[in-house]
Amino acid sequence: KMRIISVCLMQLLIIADEPTTALDVTIQAQVLELINSLKEESDSSIIMITHDLGVVAKLCDRVAIMYGGKIVEIGTDREIFYESKHPYTQGLLSCITNPEDDSDEDLQPIPGTPPDLLKPPVGCPFYARCQHAMKICKEQLPETTTFSPTHQCACWLIQAKEASHE
């Protein structure tokens, strides 16, 4: 694959779409360092599109988790990695391996298959794979619950929990 980085003077926004996919660790580190230095030197923002949560942890201040073409959770890097609310976000995080972890626990894959985006579901796109799915999840897109000015989640389960605490 050929990778091209195009930078114009006074760039306010850099969009990096899977910039480290299929790169070895050394080249990946160099690409991330370049992106970070471009950000710092030009005082620009970066939209990082990636499946690599390790890259997200190293480079991103704010994170939007998408599933089935919808943002299901958005927050600061700390809120997403340490205070995640959405079942999909929690499932993603449970799939991250820690090389320093000596436990024999197996990774827990998220069961099921992603939705057909040519025929998207009416309700929550994660419904068919969610272990907490309720009837309303299949019927309607969830509204967004705000936990802080920077942390929101779109999930009927979370709304039900929040309502029971009021």
Predicted regions and their residues:
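Serine/threonine-rich, low-complexity intrinsically disordered segments
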Residues: I4-S6, A22, A160
